[in-house]
């Protein structure tokens, strides 16, 4: 289960969502917590909240460099969410990071970061840039096992 503190939570509801996360009693082995992007106040607040829980797998939204993981406690496993051109370009470096246990990609945010308005063609298929990103992230993850 993914508990989302990023896009699924309105800005005015972030504090309440963090409080609910602290109070939740879900199985930590079955929960991933998606946090706000590095470089935001939300990222720091989300990590502080996580340290008050038993949840230990964090999905880092809009990850762009491995340096952004330096403030993540070594007790946490990381899933790097590649949602920008820079993030996709660093997929191999993410996969090699000692705390990273998985990679994901996000088509809509990727296309928006490039100035586009939609990741899919009129027929519903992904545009080439999204298909490339998906393949690159998959290959980076597969190469690391």
Where are the language model's segments positioned?
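Expand to "…catalyze enediolate/carbanion chemistry for C-C bond making/breaking, isomerization
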Residues: 1-145
């Amino acid at each position: 289960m993914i508990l989302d503190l990023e896009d699924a939570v309105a800005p005015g509801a972030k504090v309440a969502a963090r409080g609910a996360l602290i109070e939740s009693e879900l199985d930590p082995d079955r929960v991933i917590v998606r946090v706000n992007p590095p470089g935001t106040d939300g990222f720091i607040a989300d990590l502080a909240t996580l340290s008050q829980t038993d949840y230990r797998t964090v999905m880092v939204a809009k990850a762009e460099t491995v340096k952004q993981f330096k403030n993540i406690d070594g007790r946490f496993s990381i899933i790097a969410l590649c949602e920008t051109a820079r993030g996709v370009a660093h997929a191999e470096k993410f996969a090699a990071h000692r705390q990273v246990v998985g990679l994901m990609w996000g088509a809509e945010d990727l296309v928006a970061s490039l100035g586009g308005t939609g990741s899919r063609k009129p027929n519903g298929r992904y545009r080439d840039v999204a298909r490339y990103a998906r393949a690159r992230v998959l290959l980076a993850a597969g190469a690391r096992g």
